[in-house]
Amino acid sequence: VATPRLVVLLLGSVVALSGCGNLVTTEIVGAVGISVDTEGDPVVVVAVCDGYLDQVAVVQGREGLAEDETNPVVGTWDAAGQLTGVSELDLAAPGSDWQTRTPVSLETGEHYIVTARQVDADVQASQVDFFGRDLQGMEPGFVYTGAAPELDEHEAAAFEAASCPD
């Protein structure tokens, strides 16, 4: 026979645990930025502060999508090894650091979100969210971070320090 105290403890535990369904456990270990090369083609820049990441994905924004629809995938690139420190992915010409070498171009009027993550763990970098038009007139040597319409601009040399403020 359960005592009133035991029943209260059990009910309290059930209520306390029922709120855990939305627990977010993703570990953020760096930042993703967007830049351009000397031809004006988009370049993803990933700063990893701790550990490693091994995949970059570009998806379109949520404009026009139903709540249950996923963002359209523009491309996913698997790194040839572990990304540490600062790494770059030229979207128009992925180099030998990437197993996936499919080039893509970004449309001026489209909204994009770029992420970097560790495939086998709940680890990622903070994403960058921008419109293709944000890259028009951008000079090489600078990196945008954050989310449109208020992107933060960093000199490329200072991007890692800004992303990993230890």
Q: PLM features: residue spans?
A:
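Bacterial N-terminal signal peptides that target proteins for export
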Residues: 1-8
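C-terminal motif of bacterial Sec signal peptides marking the signal peptidase cleavage site
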Residues: 16-19
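Bacterial signal peptide processing site
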Residues: 21-24
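Short, surface-exposed binding/anchoring microloops in extracellular/periplasmic proteins
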Residues: 30-82
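Glycine-centered tight-turn motifs at strand-turn-strand junctions
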Residues: 77-99
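Extracytosolic low-complexity repeat regions of secreted or lipid-anchored proteins
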Residues: 93-163
